[in-house]
Curated annotation (Swiss-Prot):
This is Imidazole glycerol phosphate synthase subunit HisF. GO terms for molecular function: imidazoleglycerol-phosphate synthase activity; lyase activity. Heterodimer of HisH and HisF. It holds the Pfam family His_biosynth. Its main location: cytoplasm. Coiled coil: none annotated.
């Protein structure tokens, strides 16, 4: 079995000089968690396998600040770095990779123009392109016979709807079908975030995580809802994820990455210590 990856996620807002890491619940009510470069250094030293930076302001004025944050981080950190947020052009990808990122994460731009995945994968390689999918449960299955219906923990049937613009806009697109299409177009990984779970500390959304892990051949990164090491264990054991992304439990010092990895190792999950 391949080693499972632990990936801290840093949601970076560029509303002040140098950027700031924040964390909210269901993408709102943001509270500050620290300087992105300092946090990245800490996670690197603590044994993180990779890092994800998401520019959640992702505005035109913010792009240069983000490039600066990436360059400063790449000087200090020597594990793979994925950067996402508002990336919608080949030139933006080129700038971010040149600044020191190893991968980029595309989300809204890919939903609006799926060929963007193929174009960027053809130019930079599938290993550089992560398709981020934000999704919400939708229990209206009667009017959606063409959707992939899953059974929730309590037995309720539901499908998962792709949402874009940081969770603010529903698309009517089925998350399972979209993930399969992203793989076909050349995405090297899927970063799956449950909007229902984001910031709730209630655990990953297992039904959708497991479904994508079973249906796709590329790695699935589970995201949204981690409150303790048990949730990460369940993401691997029940959700079959290849990697676990978490934010709050690391940013505010509740658990160290090393503690989480020891917990997983004791439960026979292969991790890099």
């Amino acid at each position: 079995m391949l080693t499972k990856r632990i990936i801290p996620c840093l949601d970076v807002t560029l509303d002040r000089a140098g950027g700031c890491v924040v964390k909210g619940v269901e993408f709102v009510d943001l509270k500050e968690a620290g300087d992105p470069v300092e946090l990245a250094k800490r996670y690197n030293e603590d044994g993180a396998d990779e890092l994800v930076f998401l520019d959640i302001t992702a505005s035109a004025h913010g792009r240069e600040t983000m490039i600066d944050v990436i360059e400063r981080t790449a000087d200090e950190v020597f594990i793979p770095l994925t950067v996402g947020g508002g990336i919608s052009s080949i030139e933006a990808i080129r700038q971010i990779l040149r600044a020191g990122a190893d991968k980029v994460s595309v989300n809204t731009s890919a939903v609006k123009n799926p060929e963007f995945i193929k174009e960027s994968s053809d130019i930079f390689g599938a290993q550089c392109i992560v398709t981020a999918i934000d999704c919400k449960r939708n229990t209206n299955v009667k009017d959606n016979p063409d959707k992939t219906i899953l059974e929730l923990e309590d037995g309720t049937p539901a499908w998962y709807e792709v949402v874009i613009y940081g969770g603010r806009k529903n698309t009517g697109i089925d998350a399972v079908q979209w993930a399969k299409r992203a793989e076909e177009l050349g995405s090297g990984e899927i970063l799956l975030t449950s909007m229902d779970r984001d910031g709730t500390c209630a655990g990953y959304d297992i039904p959708i995580t497991r479904k994508l892990s079973e249906e796709l051949d590329i790695p699935i990164i589970a995201s949204g809802g981690v409150g303790n090491p048990q949730h990460i264990y369940e993401g691997f054991s029940d959700g079959k994820a290849d990697a676990a992304l978490a934010a709050s439990i690391f940013h505010f010092g509740e658990y160290s990455i090393q503690e989480v990895k020891e917990f997983l190792k004791e439960r026979k999950i292969p991790v890099r210590l």
